[in-house]
Amino acid sequence: MAHAAQVGLQDATSPIMEELITFHDHALMIIFLICFLVLYALFLTLTTKLTSTNISDAQEMETIWTILPAIILVLIALPSLRILYMTDEINDPSFTIKSIGHQWYWTYEYTDYGGLIFNSYMLPPLFLEPGDLRLLDVDNRVVLPVEAPVRMMITSQDVLHSWAVPTLGLKTDAIPGRLNQTTFTATRPGVYYGQCSEICGANHSFMPIVLELIPLKIFEMGPVFAL
Amino acid sequence: VPEPVSESLKLLGFLDVENTPCARHSILYGSLGSVVAGFGHFLFTSRIRRSCDVGVGGFILVTLGCWFHCRYNYAKQRIQERIAREEIKKKILYEGTHLDPERKHNGSSSN
């Protein structure tokens, strides 16, 4: 989860998120250099003693500052498109879970091997145990295996919601009447948090998502289904 | 609850030089390239303003060049690490079984 006042991305828990972090670093370096150049130009503009206002006939400069941004955009677009298509790859998921957004909780359905359906409500402050996270912890977590491709089918029962888990690089809209699909493969066990990411009413901030990722061997023993 | 990490140096307020792989390396080499290019230009031409422009241009070009070079090598290294990790896992899993790749290789070479 994020620590207080965190601005940067959370550590990656899936290969896609690792790629996204790499792309973010790449784009940020290009942005830094452009900002540096602009600041330098601004400094020169503010400190020049030149008063000539002849600003016509600068064909070479105009050519450079047309072609160079185009090249920069290509340098940014190519990795971006690569990751975009990577997220759409079919990776043969071994497990499918449905996630249904409601006002203001999530319902999860594990229907592959049985009919497990449960709701996931945020823990109210009065019900928090010492060590629990305010506004993040829920009564029933989504338990999933590590290193197994998982397919999430996301929809909504009422208004727009969005199922997001930043550390996995996931954010998928929950739209009533539509099934959206996202897949992921987690690379390390742990408890990971997310929050609803589409305004959905008074308690939009109070319907978090909590994933509990456990080793595949333990998951296969069926702790999820022993409710 | 994770504690906030200590404040890291962020150039222009957003480029985290300490925690971004290759950033510190690129910025340092870029600064060196900027000083060399700018100062060298000044030594040859004695033009201050133009030398500053060359210095800034040198900084941008050297930083960009080092950045791409370092990131390419970093990506290659990560791929190699991933392959090595997978192979070690496979070796542990399949050692002694009929799926052991070393056994298949030794069997084919002895034939």
From Swiss-Prot, chain A:
UniProt keyword annotation of Hydrolase present: no
Binding site for Mg(2+): 198
Record-listed Cu cation A2 binding positions: 196, 198, 200, 204
Pfam family, one: COX2_TM
Gene3D superfamilies per the UniProt record, alphabetical: 1.10.287.90, Cupredoxins - blue copper proteins
Catalysis: reaction(s): 4 Fe(II)-[cytochrome c] + O2 + 8 H(+)(in) = 4 Fe(III)-[cytochrome c] + 2 H2O + 4 H(+)(out)
InterPro entries cross-referenced by the UniProt entry: CcO_II, CcO_II-like_C, CcO_II_C, Copper_CuA, Cupredoxin, Cyt_c_oxidase_su2, Cyt_c_oxidase_su2_TM_dom, Cyt_c_oxidase_su2_TM_sf
Membrane topology (Mitochondrial matrix): 46-59
Entry GO CC: mitochondrial inner membrane; respiratory chain complex IV
Cofactor binding notes: Binds a dinuclear copper A center per subunit.
Cofactor(s) recorded in Swiss-Prot or TrEMBL: Cu cation
Superkingdom of source: Eukaryota
Keyword Chloroplast (UniProt): no
GO MF annotations, alphabetized: copper ion binding; cytochrome-c oxidase activity
GO biological process, one term: ATP synthesis coupled electron transport
Major localisation: mitochondrion
Its membrane topology: Multi-pass membrane protein
Membership in a protein family: Belongs to the cytochrome c oxidase subunit 2 family.
Assembly with partners or alone: Component of the cytochrome c oxidase (complex IV, CIV), a multisubunit enzyme composed of 14 subunits. The complex is composed of a catalytic core of 3 subunits MT-CO1, MT-CO2 and MT-CO3, encoded in the mitochondrial DNA, and 11 supernumerary subunits COX4I, COX5A, COX5B, COX6A, COX6B, COX6C, COX7A, COX7B, COX7C, COX8 and NDUFA4, which are encoded in the nuclear genome.
Protein name, entry field: Cytochrome c oxidase subunit 2
